[in-house]
From Swiss-Prot:
Keyword Magnesium belongs to the record: no
Function: May play a key role in regulating the relative amounts of cyclic and non-cyclic electron flow to meet the demands of the plant for ATP and reducing power.
Keyword Transmembrane helix: no
Superkingdom classification of source: Eukaryota
Keywords: Chloroplast, Electron transport, FAD, Flavoprotein, Membrane, NADP, Oxidoreductase, Photosynthesis, Plastid, Thylakoid, Transport
Provenance organism: Imperata cylindrica (Cogon grass)
Binding-site residues for NADP(+), renumbered to this chain: 3, 24-25
GO terms for cellular component: chloroplast stroma; chloroplast thylakoid membrane
Protein name per its UniProtKB record: Ferredoxin--NADP reductase, chloroplastic
Cell compartment(s), UniProt: Plastid, Chloroplast stroma; Plastid, Chloroplast thylakoid membrane
Enzyme Commission code: 1.18.1.2
Pathway(s) per entry: Energy metabolism; photosynthesis
Membrane topology field: Peripheral membrane protein
Length: 37
């Protein structure tokens, strides 16, 4: 699931690496939240 999400984000082609980092961290946080429930 994570790799699919990463691929989808990559397909959007965000040029700002800081934005990429923020988005990927956000996904990590969501995954952690889901895993904790």
């Amino acid at each position: 699931l994570y790799s699919i999400a990463s691929s989808a984000i990559g397909d959007f082609g965000f040029g700002d690496s800081k934005l990429d980092f923020a988005v990927s961290r956000g996904i990590d946080d969501i995954m952690v939240d889901l895993a904790a429930k």
